[in-house]
Amino acid sequence: MEKEVIAYLDNETIIDSQSVKNTNLKEIYFDNSKESLEVIRHSCAHLMAQAIKSLYPEAKFFVGPVIEDGFYYDFCVESKIGEEDLVKIEKKMKELAEAKIEISKYKITKNEALAKFQNDDLKQEVLLRIPDGAVSIYKQGEFEDLCRGPHVPNTKFLRFFKLTRVAGAYLGGDEKREMLTRIYGTAFADKESLKEYLAIIEEAKKRDHRKLGIELKLFTFNDEIGGGLPIWLGNGARLRSKLEHMLYKIHRLRGYEPVRGPELLKADAWKISGHYANYKENMYFTQIDEQEYGIKPMNCVGHIKVYQSDVRSYRDLPLKFFEYGVVHRHEKSGVLHGLFRVREFTQDDAHIFCMPSQIKEQVLEILAFVDNLMKLFDFSYEMEISTKPEKAIGDDEIWEVATKALKEALDEQGLKYGIDEGGGAFYGPKIDIKITDALKRKWQCGTIQVDFNLPSRFKLEYTDSDNEKKQPVMLHRAILGSFERFIGILTEHCAGEFPFFIAPTAVGIVPIGEAHIAYAKEIQKELLELNIDSEVYEKNESLSKKIRIAEKQKLPMILVLGDDEVAKRSVALRDRRAKEQKNLSLDEFIKLVKEKMSEVYF
């Protein structure tokens, strides 16, 4: 079965095997390749829908797309479906797969489809979103549904799948519309890959940053405050502060100038930038003195005004501004997810104003910055360049110069990268930085975006060597993306065992009895002078309980202090990795933690 063809590839378009007449196209085999999994998972979504329709005849279906690592389907039923119902749905799916049902495709006009599904309000919603013309329908047995495809030719290919969870989802993501049931699932071409993925899911549940955020007292959310608005608790605020201070120093060493723009700007500024026309639905607006103001969703306009605050010469360039900018974006409640998707967040944002000839040099500097930071946190990463789309501003020559500079910078660093042809923004090419965590999940974090648009809109200029006015190029640059999202990713990546240099509490100090508390607090004070946070466990509890409490907080180091340690001015050190205790003099311990802290400087 591994060598059976399930679809074909025409450039970047996947086509069903039953639709292909030109066999010169690239074949897609039944395996775990990216293209094959897209077909398998798309088909499995329909298999799930067919099973649901069989078990719940009143079911109506909205959309069922392929997503990263799986698929989902949104639908409505009279019955309440919970996690316990997934077993019987899976059982029915297996029956349908074993029945080896042929899957076929036919086309009708949009008007015919509207008539065909006239009694199905969800299908009417789908058709409203489809342009006029022919629409395709996929049929397997008695079940059929609107779909662009592609699909496998027979349900026999759909053997290795798992339904993973049930959730609610507003119709079309609009919280003002009805709530639908959403079931998520995944599928693979072989049993081993499915088994490996399910093991990762189980581990991911243990590492879920929302769960660890509560257990480690990092952050919380509160309905009275509002959705998507994280509240940082003491441990989380310390973690974040350490990350901010570390990055501040690195930025300064790399020649960035700290700046700060207001969080509230007149709507006129957003009209000039284009956000008012193109991004208004994602922004928050208010009236002040009968004038409209918008809360910033991005920091770029403030940095542009910093640039415009002085006359600029080619000798001044590049100018590198950075800010920990608090931004607000109107996210629908249905997509909010812990720290990964919030309405208020802080970007590690920088903007570099330079000449076109300086793009490569600046990108090289950013790539070195990225590499050092990712290695520090033990992330692997990959890059992708997005090139000029059909609709773009700026002449071909400057696009070519910018795109070539991005490619040459990546080549010079010896970095592998993908190319998303035509995937760039209309105002310039970009590099996306995608990190891979300990569970082999990929996360979009940083971006290096070349921008010809805003310098033009705000009429930015500098005087060149010939005393002529020229327009600079603007590079938008974020490495973490946002502190909130990065901390969420980092929490799951290290399962809450944060590196020593940013751990909210790096050292737990456990005095055995009351007579040892004074020495414990002396050590705590000495550590604080080194910018190392520690906690003294001085409650009147047993030694074993104190140690258990410290271990549950996933502290990098635990010190146990008794009569012997006080007398010798030493410590009994328990390392969370080694899980064994060793004795050090206080001076040796202080030297050790200084070495640990020195790891962050590069």
UniProtKB/Swiss-Prot annotation:
PROSITE patterns: AA_TRNA_LIGASE_II
Cofactor note: Binds 1 zinc ion per subunit.
Disulfide feature: none
Cellular localization per UniProt: Cytoplasm
An example Gene Ontology CC term for this record: cytosol
UniProt superkingdom: Bacteria
GO MF assignments: ATP binding; metal ion binding; threonine-tRNA ligase activity; tRNA binding
Protein name, per record: Threonine--tRNA ligase
